[in-house]
């Protein structure tokens, strides 16, 4: 008697099943070796999700077309066989990837945590413990100046690395990280060097001496408000969170320079709702997810709603600014000049939107962090405050207590103090990624192959004995009097260096110098009783830029 189909124990004949499984695994291996090993695949991650869903349906259709007796359209046997084949395909793909990254990868000789060789998510997982600049510093203390921190990522702490990766003659380019906001573009996110240089020329028109004097008029309005608020709180001589007030000041200022309208945070003494949305939306940058995963998350409304709310607010505000004429030029005026009064195209709107976001985020966070770090060092080094006041005393301030910036820019100790603070507390302390050229680069006798991601964290670089003598000692005089204490000046790059350096550096330094000079001459600064500020500095977080959320100090009016 012949067995019935219901007596058949296998979902498909065993020989056929083994052949199908072997083919599926081989296809997975070939997919990795012939496709995913080459090029970039981060811009449209959902395409790969859709492709594999279609592949699954295609496999199901092929099996169903064979019509083994037990298959029906909704058969669990069909579902199990398709699932097994797809799982085998994925096992082949990831097994090939795993073997390649651990045994055959061009970076296999570079030291680092074993798990970092396998996946970029290793670093993202470690960042739950703290910001990247501290985690990377720990890794360098354990593994040395050159550390593999991901499958294709290398962190290097050496002055030569700063020159080779970021310097004016560097052949490194920007990596996939800068596509996270695509299709919204900004000067910061252009990866193509020619396109970047063309856009930078447009920006440069807004950072000449004449333009900076115009911005100073705008900033002075908000600086006056800031000091009025600080003076009112100094009367009580109780602790205030100076970091919060610098954030209010910075966002109000940069909102005005970007959109010709303030966020009015100094007036309200609280964050604007859109700034809260921005801060929440930037949290994803803290974990340095692979670009494809970041872009996957960014399309999920439940995970990126705050970010998209801010973009909506900024888009509406930017479009209003496009149609306005302003009496005192702002940065955006130079960015609008190429339009010659016409409406922007969709690509130009994305570009203007990206640039507006860049002005706000880069200008606000970095300035507020730098000012907070300077106050921290002022409160820790009262002897340095005396030197700064001795330098400022001969200079005449106006009736509002403001100093001419041209004069401040020439003061050696003031600028040495600012530099020393930025050395130890750089506003961008961790990862500024670059992609090595096809021919690779040599750094500190180590060859980094082409198309790898490299970076040199400024927080660790500022503490490197290869760059500075006694790097842990705060000594402003190393920048003008004892310059032998700086072994290699190229290691100091708080605004980065080279073709992709911060174009807003002159504006930031003007803002910092004028604010710090007035603060020093207006107030005595100290920590509250029993505090030294260290725990608040140690609690600093990072979402590309450093964020110091708390820095309580007591201000006492001097006059």
UniProtKB/Swiss-Prot annotation:
GO cellular component, one term: membrane
InterPro entries: Cyt_P450 (IPR001128), Cyt_P450_E_grp-I (IPR002401), Cyt_P450_sf (IPR036396), Cytochrome_P450_monoxygenase (IPR050121)
A Gene Ontology biological process term: verruculogen biosynthetic process
Enzyme Commission identifier(s): 1.14.14.118
Key words, A-Z: Heme, Iron, Membrane, Metal-binding, Monooxygenase, Oxidoreductase, Transmembrane, Transmembrane helix, Virulence
CDD domains: CYP67-like (cd11061)
Membrane topology field: Multi-pass membrane protein
Superkingdom of origin: Eukaryota
Enzyme class: oxidoreductase
Biological or metabolic pathway of the protein: Mycotoxin biosynthesis
Localization in the cell: Membrane
Catalysed reactions listed for this entry: tryprostatin B + reduced [NADPH--hemoprotein reductase] + O2 = 6-hydroxytryprostatin B + oxidized [NADPH--hemoprotein reductase] + H2O + H(+)
Binding residues for heme: 502
GO MF term (any one): oxidoreductase activity, acting on paired donors, with incorporation or reduction of molecular oxygen
Matching Pfam families: p450
Residue stretches spanning the membrane: 13-35, 48-65, 82-104
Cofactor(s), names only, from the UniProt record: heme
Its biological purpose: Cytochrome P450 monooxygenase; part of the gene cluster that mediates the biosynthesis of fumitremorgins, indole alkaloids that carry not only intriguing chemical structures, but also interesting biological and pharmacological activities. The biosynthesis of fumitremorgin-type alkaloids begins by condensation of the two amino acids L-tryptophan and L-proline to brevianamide F, catalyzed by the non-ribosomal peptide synthetase ftmA. Brevianamide F is then prenylated by the prenyltransferase ftmPT1/ftmB in the presence of dimethylallyl diphosphate, resulting in the formation of tryprostatin B.
Alphabetical list of PANTHER family matching this protein: CYTOCHROME P450, L-ORNITHINE-N5-MONOOXYGENASE (EUROFUNG)
Family according to the record: Belongs to the cytochrome P450 family.
Name by which UniProt lists this protein: Tryprostatin B 6-hydroxylase
Biological source species: Aspergillus fumigatus (strain ATCC MYA-4609 / CBS 101355 / FGSC A1100 / Af293)
Gene of this entry: ftmP450-1
